[in-house]
Regions:
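A generic structural signal for well-ordered coil/turn residues at beta-strand boundaries
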Residues: 6, 43-45, 69-70
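C-terminal structural segments of small proteins and small subunits
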Residues: 56-88
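A short, terminal or domain-edge coil/loop segment
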Residues: 1, 24-32, 84-88
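Short glycine-/aliphatic-rich beta-strand segments at the starts of folded cytosolic domains
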Residues: 4-11
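Amphipathic, hydrophobic secondary-structure cores in small proteins
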Residues: 13-15, 22-64
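Short, flexible beta-strand-to-coil junctions
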Residues: 11-14, 77-79
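Solvent-exposed alpha-helices and their adjacent loops that cap or buttress functional pockets
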Residues: 1-4, 41
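Short N-terminal helix-initiation segments at or just after the protein's N-terminus
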Residues: 13-19, 84-88
Length: 88
């Protein structure tokens, strides 16, 4: 049986915002990376931020510090090649 992986996806409003959040998060030592927005969620700007669920509150605080907002937060569950998303 395939192991399950859980992570968060934050949908950013624009590419510049995605890059600013990624840069700020990495400076804080967070494990984040820009990914293409999964088509099953929403198109948005085309880029999202993948993050560890344990860092969700820290990410929200960083967004507030930077004066940026998101189109939504999702929790992902990946089993093998299958990924499901739940909006939070």
């Amino acid at each position: 049986m395939a192991a399950k992986e859980y992570y968060g996806v934050a949908l950013l409003k624009n590419t510049r915002g995605a890059m600013a959040v990624e840069d700020g998060a990495k400076k804080k030592g967070m494990a984040v990376r820009i990914i293409p927005t999964p088509s099953t969620i929403y198109a948005s700007c085309g880029f999202s931020l993948k993050y560890e669920l344990t860092e969700e509150e820290t990410l929200k605080e960083l967004l507030q510090e930077l004066g940026l907002s998101v189109d939504g937060f999702y929790h992902a569950e990946k089993t093998g090649l299958s990924v499901s998303y739940e909006k939070v």
